[in-house]
């Protein structure tokens, strides 16, 4: 592009001294020139002007005559630029060998001078006098900034003088004044012929090259030029080459600036500089289009940030819907970063626009300049215009369809205003009823056509007489246009064909077949009288009438054709109406959202709702509950109970039994996983299902450990589902709050806890309770190594007698059936099975009262599988002979295991039991025998089994069999795969030695078993039991830490029986252990090493100051102890020491994610919802919590103990608080690490967490 001419210095500064001096000089020159013109002969130009053609013939000389046509179209003088030079190349075609000649050649040529004078006179002078206003671009009408050509004035003056001197006036003359304009520039040279310069005609230096005889004193000769009028123009030296003009044009590679250019060339613009440039400058903002509006805008900005630093970016959105439109504007700014080269915003925008093929995901975007945002604004307006046109087109189509529909009745003059409910209102009929039209109130007529709903004639029921349909009356569900789509969505699970509407209601039509009738009946049964928004959907089922032979097919075909004829247009109208309603809903929602977007109003609504909830809770807990409690107090209704002969509620108190598993008193620890109301009343239920309260009725049959398989099945007794309300209002603490209030109070109590050094975890949650509740275990199967697992209530002798009596009747039936089945007298076999080791325990061991009070509930693994009621068997199965023998022996040995040394009250019951068993056994002996069933010769026993023997190799060795009974080894080898064991005798000897070592009696006959380890399945088969955890009672037989805990528990139980206070002794032992310092003897080398280590520590103490905790933390790498985590006897996982740890040694740091208090509460709720039962949250202060649930170390596995061996300290290191675990006393190898969680004591709280540490000083609860 060409650079436009700039303003001159004189225009900007007209009062400058230099400008004034130049103006004065020009005025003097003009004055001198005028004086010269008046002194000479007046110049007249004789010419002939043709009136028809407007041609002026000028006669300037006898030899020079030029005729020209002067017209407005031909006379267009060019405006010279300020930068023009008089020596530039000027095209010329008069008397020149080249079409391009220099300015000097045109000035010094006579013919050129005459031609130029004639041409100028013919093209300038007549136009200035004849048509001065017809040329806007002429020098006279040009602005002051235009500068006329000096050569033009020079040639015109010379032509004027010659014409006035040589041409007399003849014929009709036209005198044209030759006055110069007032702003005419003074010529730089004298217009008259004068010496222009000197030309060297002889140069002796050049002549001496060819002629050596030239004298050295010879001087060059010069000749003046310029005075001749007819001097030929000088030749162009560039054309003096041998190859001429073509060689010059084509060989300019070594002179690129002298290239011949036949067309103007764009000059490179100057770079923009805000300091010297005027105007907005090049654009720095671009607009990006054609990308997917659904992708994140960060991807677009990330791609265009590679061109430069982005100052601002805007993803254009729809002003009404808020949806993105798919184009954005990005503005760049100058980037001056020390690590990168500087990039200006102009260059960044230019690079972004010039880049090709930029992809955003799978779309190639388009980038254009948008300096002031006009392009993006125009695109937004076009988009809105297209949407408006589209909406208007749809509206016109709707109106056209409405105009084509037949009128259904008179319409009122004023149409009701279509108002929409607020966005928060439901999109149902209730929301439509809230919109009250403004204007003249109208009475709704059922006969008129509802907007968007095509009503059919009133005889629709007659048309559908042969089809199954359901009729919904208009009284129950009003006929509104918004009801129909919601009704279709509600009934979409039923196979209806269509829903037709008339002024009386809705007709839900089904297919005329057996399937359609079935679907209609199913829909009627499921949906009739159900809630549909705020309406009661009342239905009437109308099945097709019985078919008649005459005309039934004709009626059915006519009804079907009528229905299908109207189905298609109704479907289209319904689809269009639904789409228009959705668009109207969207527009109204936008308006309401923009109108109601006020955070203050929303905050007021939130506060109002919370205050309403608190008020209702306060009324329910503080007003209603005490009033109901006082009203339902049994003492206030004593007279009425006596009148109606009703028992006192205290007489209905149930007695806990062993079989029920409820062996703890009301004073004991409540079950944390039981129902909240049952926890408050202190009553333990045998099962804890999630949020389902189990009720008991007086006289309910208790399940025993054994179920009589031969007893008659009694009909089930109808039980009341709920007890009367006074059962729950016995104690004042149970009527204070409901379940929801209990949960709310627990949350509030948790929020108001003070900051303490404890992890907010290890709590029993509802999720854990619900998980454990689905496991078929009873309360007696508590999996815990604490004293609670072995604590049993004191049992009465009367209860034992009842149990024995029930067992005797069972044994009688079993023995009788066995005798009939096997033909064996069981009396003769009683002696063989006395003193069996692996007999099944039936009654658990009794426990002391102290153990009952210290019992803690823990529902993980059952402690005993016999103490619970048996499951309902899937079917009766016959017992084996072995099982039949084991049960009576178990009944015999059980009273012996129950009997305690000091229990004298059970002696009479034992004697009675023995007598009853003896009499029962005698009664079972048959009086007469059938001699045919017995052999006549004495029998020789082939196999004599020792006591408690099982099939094994020693049994086969002592077996005396005949040759017929010996198995065929060759046949067995072909049938089964064999294995080579080498020497059979050596293998047998090795196996017998191993069996002797593993057996209890060191014999081959005794079984290799662990006493009490084998527990039979209650259902008789392991497959029917499902998956169970291993009981802690079984783990205590082989796991070291369980064995240690069990031994300590047994020692405490023994001390309690002797009357010693275990808690006091434990406190004394802890105090002695804390004060005791173990002196360890070391060798000489060890002592020297310790001295060096102590000296090193002292030096570091001096450097760090007196803060010993900080010093210990800095030595964590040197003093960290090796620990491991494994299954704990206290709870889930635990941390164990892998070496002996001395007192006050640092063990490990509690590492986790540091979060704020508010974030920790949100995370705790999230963990509970996601099923994470335990959350490892450790509070540092009021505002900081360490969360080690998902990011943390193994220190989170340290359990709580009331007699801990560690402590947690919070120390400050380099401005941040850290949690470090220290040893309180000497810790042995493989000892579990524990510390006190230090929960706040909540005496009287209904949501207390039981403690499971099992120590002598256990407080029972964590809180």
From Swiss-Prot:
It comes from Gibberella zeae (strain ATCC MYA-4620 / CBS 123657 / FGSC 9075 / NRRL 31084 / PH-1) (Wheat head blight fungus). S-adenosyl-L-methionine binds at residue 1237. Residues 869-882 have a biased composition (Basic residues). SMART domains: N-SET (SM01291), PostSET (SM00508), SET (SM00317). The RxxxRR motif forms an adapter helix that bridges the nucleosome and ubiquitin. Residues 72-96, 118-195, 211-243, 404-443, 544-592, 648-688, 749-783, 833-922 are annotated as: Disordered. Residues 221-243, 561-582, 675-688, 749-765, 907-922 have a biased composition (Basic and acidic residues). Catalytic component of the COMPASS (Set1C) complex that specifically mono-, di- and trimethylates histone H3 to form H3K4me1/2/3. Binds RNAs which might negatively affect its histone methyltransferase activity. COMPASS recognizes ubiquitinated H2B on one face of the nucleosome which stimulates the methylation of H3 on the opposing face. GO terms for molecular function: histone H3K4 trimethyltransferase activity; RNA binding. Residues 1121-1238 form the SET domain. It holds the Pfam family SET_assoc. Its main location: nucleus. Residues 151-181, 431-441 have a biased composition (Polar residues). A motif (RxxxRR motif) lies at residues 1087-1092. Component of the Set1C/COMPASS complex. InterPro entries: COMPASS_Set1_N-SET, Nucleotide-bd_a/b_plait_sf, Post-SET_dom, Set1-like, Set1_fungi, SET_assoc, SET_dom, SET_dom_sf. Residues 1247-1263 form the Post-SET domain. This is Histone-lysine N-methyltransferase, H3 lysine-4 specific. Belongs to the class V-like SAM-binding methyltransferase superfamily. Residues 118-134 have a biased composition (Low complexity).
């Amino acid at each position: 592009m060409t650079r436009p001419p700039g303003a001159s210095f004189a225009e900007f500064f007209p009062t400058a001294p230099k400008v004034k001096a130049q103006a004065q000089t020009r005025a003097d020159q003009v004055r001198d020139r005028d004086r010269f013109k008046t002194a000479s002969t007046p110049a007249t130009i004789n010419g002939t002007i043709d009136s028809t053609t407007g041609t002026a013939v000028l006669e300037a000389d006898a030899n020079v005559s030029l005729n020209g046509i002067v017209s407005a179209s031909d006379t267009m003088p060019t405006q010279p630029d300020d930068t023009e030079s008089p020596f530039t190349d000027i095209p010329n075609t008069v008397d020149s060998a080249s079409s391009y000649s220099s300015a000097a050649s045109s000035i010094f040529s006579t013919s050129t001078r005459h031609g130029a004078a004639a041409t100028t006179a013919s093209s300038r002078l007549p136009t200035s006098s004849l048509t001065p206003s017809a040329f806007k671009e002429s020098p006279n009408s040009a602005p002051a900034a235009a500068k006329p050509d000096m050569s033009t004035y020079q040639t015109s003056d010379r032509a004027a003088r010659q014409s006035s001197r040589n041409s007399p006036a003849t014929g009709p003359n036209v005198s044209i004044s030759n006055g110069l304009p007032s702003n005419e520039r003074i010529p730089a040279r004298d217009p008259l012929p004068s010496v222009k310069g000197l030309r060297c005609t002889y140069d002796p230096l050049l002549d001496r090259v060819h002629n050596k005889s030239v004298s050295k004193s010879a001087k060059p000769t010069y000749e003046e030029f310029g005075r001749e009028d007819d001097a030929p123009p000088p030749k162009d030296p560039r054309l003096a080459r041998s190859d001429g003009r073509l060689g010059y044009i084509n060989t300019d590679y070594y002179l690129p600036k002298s290239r011949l250019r036949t067309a103007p060339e764009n000059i490179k613009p100057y770079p923009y500089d805000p300091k010297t440039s005027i105007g907005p400058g090049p654009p720095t903002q671009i607009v990006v289009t054609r990308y997917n509006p659904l992708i994140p805008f960060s991807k677009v900005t990330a791609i265009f940030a590679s061109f430069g630093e982005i100052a601002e970016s805007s993803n254009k959105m729809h002003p009404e819907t808020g949806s993105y439109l798919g184009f954005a504007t990005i503005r760049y700014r100058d980037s001056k970063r020390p690590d990168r080269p500087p990039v200006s915003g102009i260059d960044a925008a230019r690079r972004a626009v010039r880049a090709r093929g930029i992809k955003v995901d799978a779309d190639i975007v388009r980038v254009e300049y948008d300096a002031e945002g006009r392009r993006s604004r125009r695109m937004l307006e076009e988009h809105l215009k297209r949407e408006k046109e589209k909406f208007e087109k749809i509206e016109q189509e709707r109106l056209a369809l409405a105009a084509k529909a037949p009128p259904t009745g008179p319409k009122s003059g004023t149409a009701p205003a279509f108002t929409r409910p607020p966005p928060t209102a439901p999109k149902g009929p209730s929301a439509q009823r809230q919109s009250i039209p403004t204007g003249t109130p109208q009475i709704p007529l059922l006969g008129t056509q509802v907007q968007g709903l095509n009503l059919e004639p009133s005889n629709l029921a007659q048309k559908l007489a042969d089809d199954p349909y359901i009729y919904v009356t208009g009284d129950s569900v009003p006929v509104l246009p918004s009801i129909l789509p919601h009704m279709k969505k509600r009934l979409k699970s039923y196979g209806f064909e269509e829903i037709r509407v008339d002024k009386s209601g809705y007709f839900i039509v089904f297919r005329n077949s057996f399937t359609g009738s079935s679907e209609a009946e199913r829909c009627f049964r499921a949906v009739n009288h159900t809630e549909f928004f705020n309406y009661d959907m009342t239905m009437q089922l109308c099945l097709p009438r019985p078919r008649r032979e005459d005309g039934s097919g004709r009626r059915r075909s006519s009804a079907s054709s009528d229905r299908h004829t109207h189905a298609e247009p109704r479907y289209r109208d319904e689809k269009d109406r639904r789409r228009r309603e959705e668009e109207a809903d969207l527009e109204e929602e936008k308006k309401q959202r923009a109108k109601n977007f006020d955070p203050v109003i929303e905050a007021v609504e939130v506060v109002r709702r919370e205050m309403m909830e608190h008020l209702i809770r306060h009324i329910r807990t503080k007003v209603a509950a005490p009033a109901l409690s006082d009203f339902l107090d049994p003492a206030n209704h004593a007279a009425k109970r006596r009148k109606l002969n009703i028992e006192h509620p205290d007489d209905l108190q149930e007695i806990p039994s062993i079989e029920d598993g409820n062996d703890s008193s009301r004073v004991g620890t409540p079950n944390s996983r039981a129902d909240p109301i049952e926890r408050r009343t202190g009553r333990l239920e045998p099962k804890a299902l999630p949020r389902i309260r189990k009720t008991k009725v007086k006289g309910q049959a208790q399940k025993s450990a054994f179920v009589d398989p031969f007893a008659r099945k009694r009909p089930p007794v109808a039980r009341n589902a709920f007890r009367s309300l006074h059962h729950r209002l016995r104690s004042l603490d149970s009527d204070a709050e409901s379940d929801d209030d209990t949960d709310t109070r627990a949350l509030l109590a948790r929020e108001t806890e003070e900051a303490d050094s404890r992890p907010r975890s290890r709590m029993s949650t509802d999720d854990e309770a619900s998980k454990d509740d689905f496991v078929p275990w009873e309360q007696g199967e508590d999996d815990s190594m604490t004293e609670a697992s072995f604590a049993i209530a004191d049992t009465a002798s009367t209860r034992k007698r009842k149990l024995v009596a029930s067992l005797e009747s069972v044994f009688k039936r079993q023995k009788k059936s066995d005798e009939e089945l096997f033909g064996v007298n069981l009396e003769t076999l009683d002696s063989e099975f006395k003193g069996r080791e692996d007999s099944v325990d039936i009654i658990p061991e009794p426990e002391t009262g102290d153990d009952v009070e210290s019992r803690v509930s823990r529902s993980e693994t059952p402690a005993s599988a016999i103490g619970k009621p048996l499951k309902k068997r899937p079917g009766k199965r016959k017992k084996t002979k072995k099982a039949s023998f084991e049960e009576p022996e178990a009944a015999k040995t059980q009273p012996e295991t129950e009997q305690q040394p000091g229990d004298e009250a059970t002696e009479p019951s034992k004697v009675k039991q023995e007598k009853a068993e003896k009499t029962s056994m005698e009664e079972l002996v048959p009086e007469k025998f059938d001699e045919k069933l017995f052999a006549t010769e004495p029998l020789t026993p082939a196999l004599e089994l020792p006591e408690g023997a099982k099939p094994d190799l020693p049994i086969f060795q002592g077996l005396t069999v005949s040759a017929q009974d010996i198995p065929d080894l060759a046949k067995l080898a072909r049938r089964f795969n064999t294995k080579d064991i080498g020497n059979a005798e050596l293998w047998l000897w090795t196996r017998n030695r191993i069996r002797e070592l593993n057996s209890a009696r060191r014999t081959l006959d005794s079984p290799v078993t662990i006493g009490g380890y084998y527990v039979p399945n209650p259902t008789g088969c392991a497959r029917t039991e499902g998956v169970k955890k291993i009981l802690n009672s079984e783990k205590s037989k082989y796991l070291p830490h369980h064995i240690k805990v069990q031994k300590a528990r047994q020692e405490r139980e023994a001390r309690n029986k002797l009357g010693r206070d275990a808690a006091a002794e434990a406190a004394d032992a802890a105090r002695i252990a804390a004060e005791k310092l173990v002196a360890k003897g070391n060798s000489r080398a060890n002592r020297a090493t310790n001295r060096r280590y102590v000296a090193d520590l002292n030096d570091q103490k001096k450097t760090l100051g007196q803060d010993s905790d900080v010093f210990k933390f800095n030595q964590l790498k040197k003093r960290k102890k090796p620990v491991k985590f494994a299954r704990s006897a206290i709870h889930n996982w635990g941390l164990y020491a892998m070496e002996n740890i001395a007192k006050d040694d640092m063990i490990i740091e509690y590492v986790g994610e540091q979060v704020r208090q508010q974030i920790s509460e949100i995370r705790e709720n999230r963990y509970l919802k996601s099923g994470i039962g335990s959350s490892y949250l450790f509070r540092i202060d009021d505002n900081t919590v360490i969360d080690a649930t998902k990011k943390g170390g193994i220190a989170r596995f340290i359990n709580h103990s009331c007699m801990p061996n560690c402590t947690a300290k919070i120390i400050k290191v380099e401005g941040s608080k850290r949690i470090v675990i220290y040893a309180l006393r000497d810790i042995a190898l493989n000892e579990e690490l524990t510390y006190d969680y230090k929960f706040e004591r909540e005496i009287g709280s209904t949501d207390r967490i039981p403690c499971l540490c099992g120590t002598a000083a256990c407080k029972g609860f964590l809180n």
